[in-house]
Regions:
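Glycan-binding loop/region signatures in secreted carbohydrate-active enzymes
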Residues: 20-103
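Loop/turn elements at helix/coil->beta-strand transitions in domains of secreted/extracellular proteins
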Residues: 9-15, 107-111
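A Trp-anchored, charged/polar loop motif used as the substrate-binding/catalytic surface
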Residues: 1-5, 14, 94-98
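A general structural signal for short secondary-structure junctions and capping/turn motifs
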Residues: 5-8, 102-106
Length: 111
């Protein structure tokens, strides 16, 4: 945010958006599902969204609940990712959005 302000963009022109989707990849090595795992390309589309490489938040949650995906949280990047069945998906959830909003509004020059 500070960089945009330094570039001359007034705070009143900056808005914060919330993404309720994830970007998904088919991984090359299913036994290695951490951040940075090699990807072969976009994962097949979700059951409802049907767009390769794109999962709706509800599809990610359903996959986690059904045990098809396992959620992990990257404390450095402050974002979750989920993996399973040769798929790796990065997304935002309540925890990551809470941390990002808190950071945006409590830094030295908050919005």
């Amino acid at each position: 945010m500070r960089e945009w302000e330094i570039a001359g963009i007034p705070k009143s022109s900056i808005s914060v958006g919330l993404a309720l989707y994830g970007r998904a990849w088919t991984v090359a090595y299913p036994d290695s599902m951490g951040v940075g795992v090699a990807a072969l390309g976009p994962a097949p589309g979700g059951a409802f969204t049907e767009e390769p490489g794109y999962y709706g938040f509800f599809e990610i949650c359903a996959g986690i609940k059904a045990g098809q995906l396992k959620r992990q949280f990257d404390r450095y990047a402050r974002v979750p990712h989920a993996s399973g069945q040769n798929i790796w998906v990065s997304y935002d959830d309540v925890e990551s959005i809470r941390q990002k909003v808190r950071k945006a509004y409590t830094t030295q020059n908050p919005l």
